[in-house]
Structures are given as C-alpha cells and as structure tokens.
C-alpha cells in the first residue's frame, strides 16, 4: 500500500478488511436523513418510529450504503471507487446503536470489456450492531488502480 492506497497487483484474496466502528447519535440520524433529503418520519420522529414498533428513530438506507462503502474504501485507499453495490436491509440501526462493519475481499478480476481495462475487487461486508445482530449484508465491487496505470 502506498499513500494513494492499494494497487490491484498487491492485493491477495481472500483477505479480511480492518473493522470499522461507528457510534450512531440521535443527531446524526436526523442530520443524515436531512442531508440526503429522506424525509420519511421514521428517521426523525420518535413517535412515528415507535408507532411502527421501533424503540426510536433509525438510520436510512443511504447511511448504511455510505458506511459499507467506507469499510471498503478505507481499506483500498483514496484512488478506489465503488462501481457496484448490492445490499439487503435485515434489521434497523437505531439512534444510540453502534454500527460495526466487517469486510472481506473475496475475489479480484480484470474487466477487459472496456478500454482501458478495469481492475476490480469483490468485497463482502457485514454491518452488525453492538449486540452482534446482522443489520445489512452487502456485496460490492471496487475499482482500484493497476500497476500499469489502468484501473
């Protein structure tokens, strides 16, 4: 790894990614919903969330997607980018919870269908809460730089 992040040739799979921990405050849940223009009341109105059967407000889908992306790109470095993401919402992450992201790079490949070819790494991420409950399984693909300048 250089200061610019990982180079595709340097990556051996499978490899575990460093764990990322994020404590979710009430304020962040509300701010994130507003910043992403997601005005569904379950993200900012505790009475509405409770009427749905939740103990309090909960993070939105974009918050979870951004967190999963962070798990992958913090590992791969600033020259990496997410080119594909598939995720499933399994359980809510509530205000006051701690999100824990655990990832694993499981495959790497070169996409020669484009010019220049893209260097890709497939990553599986599990977003869990502080109780160990699976909140969001994620599969994503990163494009990373190649040693020959392609990527």
Could you tell me what each predicted segment is?
Residues 1-81, 147-151:
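Hot-dog-fold acyl-thioester-processing enzymes
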Residues 20-24, 88, 141-143:
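Generic structural detector for well-ordered beta-strands
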Residues 1-18, 93-151:
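HotDog/MaoC-like acyl-thioester-processing domains
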Residues 36-37, 49, 84, 101, ...:
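Short, charged/polar low-complexity linear motifs in solvent-exposed/disordered segments
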Residues 74-101:
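Mid-chain, well-packed structural core segment of small domains
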């Amino acid at each position: 790894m250089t200061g610019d992040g990982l180079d595709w040739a340097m990556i051996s799979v499978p490899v575990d990614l460093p764990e990322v921990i994020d404590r979710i405050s009430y304020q962040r849940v509300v701010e994130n919903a507003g910043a992403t223009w997601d005005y569904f009341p379950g993200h900012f109105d505790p009475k509405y969330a409770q009427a749905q059967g939740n103990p309090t407000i909960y993070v939105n889908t974009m918050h979870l997607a951004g967190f999963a992306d962070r798990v992958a790109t913090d590992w791969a470095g600033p020259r990496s980018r997410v080119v594909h993401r598939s995720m499933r919402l399994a359980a809510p992450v509530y205000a006051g919870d701690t999100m824990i992201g655990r990832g694993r790079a499981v495959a790497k490949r070169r996409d020669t269908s484009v010019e220049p070819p893209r260097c890709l790494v497939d990553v599986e991420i599990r977003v869990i809460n502080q109780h160990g409950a699976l909140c969001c399984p994620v599969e994503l693909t990163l494009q990373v730089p190649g040693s020959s300048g392609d990527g």
